[in-house]
Amino acid sequence: MIIACGIAVSAYPQQALYPSSFPLGDVQLLDSRFSKAQALNVDVLLKYDVDRLLAPYLKEAGLTPKAESFPCWDGLDGHVGGHYLTALAIHYASTGDPRLKERMDYMISELKRCQDASGNGYVGGVPDGKPLWDGLKSGNIELVWKYWVPWYNVHKTYAGLRDAWLYAGDTQAKDMFLKFCDWGLDIIAPLSDEQMEAMLDQEFGGMPEVFADAYAITVDRKYLDGARRFSHHWLLDSMAAGVDNLDNKHANTQVPKVVGYERIAEVADDSLYRDASVFFWETVSGTRSLSIGGNSRREHFAPKDDCKSYVTDREGPESCNTNNMLKLSEGLFRMSRDARYADFYERALYNHILSTQHPVHGGYVYFTPARPAHYRVYSQPNSGMWCCVGTGMENHGKYGEFIYSHFGDSLYVNLFIPSRLDWKEKGVTVTQTGDFPADDSVSFTVDVKKPARFTLMLRHPGWCDNMQVTVNGKPVSVTSAPQSYLAIDRKWKKGDRVDLKLPMKVSVEEVPNVPDYISVVYGPVVLAARYSTEGLDGLVADDSRWAHIAHGPLVSVFDTPVLIGSREEIVDALKSMEPVEGKPLHFRVPRLLKGKYASMELEPFADIHDARYMLYWLSMTQDRYDNYLKMEKAAEAMSLDLDRRTIDVVKPGEQQPEADHFMANEQSKTGYLNDVAWRDASDGGFFSYRMKPAGEKGALLLVKYWGNEPEGRQVEIYIEGELIASENLSGKWGIDEFVTESYALPEWVTANDAVTVTFQSVERGNTGGIYDVRIVKP
């Protein structure tokens, strides 16, 4: 069914655009971890300097900024401002706090000044954006690569304006949003389908989603056409055909695309887009996600035969990805009412999203390392303008969005979060109470003005074998299976009470394709353990370029607790874990954690902060572990030594490391060999990075090459324009493996805090692939 209906004026734009959702203001969070997180996030949002967030927009509109722009992540100026506008709207809708509305109104008025000054509907903060947009309109697609993901950037402003109307009812923001959409359509109108596809090779956020929403608002076909034009067929067509082509792809480039595909499927009843969305969700949630619901490492989907990198890399699942996977899950649920989407939503919400907010100062998390005994770092207000700060601003105001849904006379309970629902259309109030998941009981009390008939649909979670339900103390005769909904159809009276019992059991989940690493799960809760509080370098991040990464020393897996035994023995030992008195969801496992680890407690991962932790555990029989120790310990020691010596490192061909190092390039391309990314340059082209010797005397430059390059592969390496090495790679080693070469850095180089390292090709030649570039201590 096509749901687009042409929305003119509505008291509840959220419900008009998403008919099965309740307005955030109609779902009140009651006392719980979620309500506390929401309240804390309001305090954090109010600490941000709005004029500094607005400065990039004013500058690009030719107006005088009222404050300086934030310096962190310069080049992506304006993206966090869009997220912040969304966050204000969401939290205002959820709490009614007038301070949030005051800020939202101010932002909209300032953005309106910017849009009016532009004269063409544009309102964005992309630095020096006019030459870009003019060039794109004239067909110069290559220009996007000279900017930092500009469509991704402006998408945040599109979403912010839409959300100010969607959640907070601001009609001026809606008008601005549609004018901005018209500007976007004007930019892409002259472009051929081939040019669009080439442009969409770069990250562009959720552009198809916002145009699909513009269509849902207006029923003007031009916006739906725009949404389809922003559909990257490289991904859309493969997903619709059931082909997984996600290995080594930047994860949060792909997920927002599919959020858009789902939205197009929803508003246009398009089966191709629906099939693509479902297959993508099944692929990512089923084979490319960790137990907490997060995905990716170093921002990329791991290749299926290298998933061990999930537990070896310091850069684990990115928070933005999970934010968008929740949007996708919610959308697919709206189309299908399939409980599996709600099960995934619950897992990701309880274990990843909750964990990305510090419970005291409210800082946001970028990466959640799954490597044993590593840790997370946190943002602070007015510093670190990361993408995950932007989505972090939004996350904690939306906890009420998916607790309940309604379809006709059916009320779906999707999440077990203490809350009070005001179902105005039915004159029904439902109050949900309990201390789930610390306690396995949940209660619902119905309050109606007069008896009302509706069907209460209670989610039977996939992790619960035997859900028990009573109405007014009497067991219901209806049965249900795990990962489904139990229906109670009756005429409800004031004071009717429904009680659920949700027995939880312990289980283990493996890293995808890596059975030797397991995570412990209890019901929907991932249990982890605190390892230590030592070496938490950069725990609260500053404005430095890479402060979102936990740069403290890595711990050898051989210095962490290992779960010894067969899988059956380990699961059996976990089944006998002992609750810790006075500490809900804390357990000791004396049959597994012994000796110096005997005092370790398993507890909800989302509750562990300011500490190194064990989220995944190496798990083997004693014989296998003894053999593994002999084979891998030396290699692990070498890897950790290189990590310890590394001052700065770039992974060529990977988006964020290159952006973080201010890459410049001409005649350059990227690819993968043996699942390792590379970059090269040809025919006099080059690529360069800003790198930091940090004053380290005797520092070395290490460059990784492929050991069997064909003819015509020659690279010249320059630092600050001075040639330091020239390599003819053709036939140099003649081996099919990677080779790392070391180059001594002159003292004048190491005395600098930062230098430009350039890889230059010769005329009619090619540099060969460069796979890793790092500056290390001697």
Residue locations for each model-derived region?
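Solenoidal tandem-repeat scaffolds enriched in leucines and small polar residues
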Residues: 181, 188, 194, 198-233, ...
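C-terminal beta-rich recognition modules with glycine/proline-rich loops and embedded aromatic residues
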Residues: 277, 342-351, 356-445, 481, ...
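Bacterial N-terminal signal peptides
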Residues: 1-8
